């Protein structure tokens, strides 16, 4: 085979590959377009069945949520403080108990 025939065969092969790629691309685009239309119809159907909230209402919910989050943070801080305070009081009570036992021992020793 000479160079000219090889180039012609190569060009034909490239043409067939390009046709195949074009056909697969067209199928993919067609399927994507069909899916997009079906999804749009489904969205319209769902929007009719389940109404969405207005932007103002959603903003009110966000503000309410933010307020509750702030209150929750404040409560968590207070709970942490009270837990620490309770722990400190328990330690203080233990120290008092130890001191009271020492005082009792000392007074018992002094009496005897």
Curated annotation (Swiss-Prot):
InterPro entries named in the record: BLI1
UniProt key word Transport: yes
Keywords attached to this entry: Coiled coil, Endosome, Transport
Subcellular localization, as worded in the UniProt entry: Endosome
Coiled-coil ranges per UniProt: 55-105
Keyword Cell membrane applies: no
Major localization listed first in the record, in broad terms: other
Any one GO CC term of the record: endosome
Family: Belongs to the BLI1 family.
Subunit comment: Component of the biogenesis of lysosome-related organelles complex-1 (BLOC-1).
Function: Component of the biogenesis of lysosome-related organelles complex-1 (BLOC-1) involved in endosomal cargo sorting.
Name by which UniProt lists this protein: Biogenesis of lysosome-related organelles complex 1 subunit BLI1
Gene: BLI1
